[in-house]
């Protein structure tokens, strides 16, 4: 059931902890919001012509999404104050000495930066969440917070701008989702024409949908409505949700700009902004869209940013849009794979990959409880591999950008529920899909960089579980051999001698002269060996399934 579609009459009587019928502290003002005011102290000189708070010019001079938006001059406006500091330090937390906190952070690999960073919590109760949130947590069976949650919750609940850096699968979504619910419940109720109070920007539709699912679970008790705004589907239902009014909007940048451009919603009420997987959004070229969107939001908002990595581009975005932020990093900033994942890298010829995959899949699926995610470099190869596996008796399904959204949703559901044990995907799924119970990841094609390799294999071995990742490495990938060996060594994995030799001969940047050494056959396309068979064929998910082997 989606709470965003409900019409509320205000007759909900679930009062608790001093909250009104919507779970919110009473507030009188409704449509009296001014659209301006700022934090003051704006500085010139930031990248791309933006000042300290991202007040820019360049991105408004081009056509495309958001071309009709007018950049707001916040310095000449007055903003009505809002509440954002809800953190009350628990007695147990307060009584811990600095030495104990330092030791605990060291044990959990938590590193913090900034002034007056709150101490980490160790339980849900210590985080200071209201009873209605704690009840949802207990009902859903959560036992203990993850390290990123332990430190991020007191940071976000205190109303500070913050950056959280942690590996995929570490619980980042709840790190901002639960504080967002508390934030909403302390704001005045929405009035007709109001936009959302919380805005979450995400790089992919799949990730946006998963965030929405978490928001729905934990917003249920206080009837917080949400909607998910992304491309590839009709705008009508999304427009309907926005017009009816939602407290939370989870969106991909392009579709949200489309909605803003056509006056289907506004961001005047946004006081809690989340940039999730910021590094991925920048990798996908969303920086201009992000800047246009954020410029429409009052600058005294609370902004939280989460990322799996901390490159210079993400650091610049944080400097431009976060005010006096504090930062938590869990684990090393160096690129590293989870030690819960067994990494098996095989050096093979391009022409042998398909046969190798068939052999490995047969071995893996001897256990019917296993769930396999296969990554390919292109949509064509994803479809080819899906057909190959189905013809071999394995009920594989493919997901990539050329599939219609309803088909993608169906494939995800089939995979998530275990009806299909194999999903073949392009990188649209590498960081946007969170499916529990993935036991094996296959890199049929090695990605363009080792960072994507780490994110791909991070689909397994999540939340303390064990996982296995198979990778077929060819001479085409030689320039990444040295970095891959480093990742394998750090995780104490066995290394194929052929890969070590490839790394020695590789320049690490241009591929070296290794291809002259004879491992590759040359002339084959990446993911090749198929020739021109099935060229132009579509509908891989409807390819005939041979006599089932599963």
Curated annotation (Swiss-Prot):
Location relative to the cell: Cytoplasm; Nucleus
Keyword annotations of the record: ATP-binding, Cytoplasm, Helicase, Hydrolase, Nonsense-mediated mRNA decay, Nucleotide-binding, Nucleus, Ribosome biogenesis, RNA-binding, rRNA processing
Main EC class the enzyme belongs to: hydrolase
UniProt-annotated stretches for the region Disordered: 1-25, 525-550
GO cellular component labels: cytoplasm; cytosol; nucleolus; nucleus; ribonucleoprotein complex
InterPro entries: DEAD/DEAH_box_helicase_dom, Helicase_ATP-bd, Helicase_C-like, P-loop_NTPase, RNA-helicase_DEAD-box_CS, RNA_helicase_DEAD_Q_motif
Motif (DEAD box): 276-279
Location of the motif Q motif: 122-150
Swiss-Prot/TrEMBL domain comment: The Q motif is unique to and characteristic of the DEAD box family of RNA helicases and controls ATP binding and hydrolysis.
Protein name: ATP-dependent RNA helicase dbp2
Taxonomy of the source species: Eukaryota, Fungi, Dikarya, Ascomycota, Taphrinomycotina
Gene that specifies this protein: dbp2
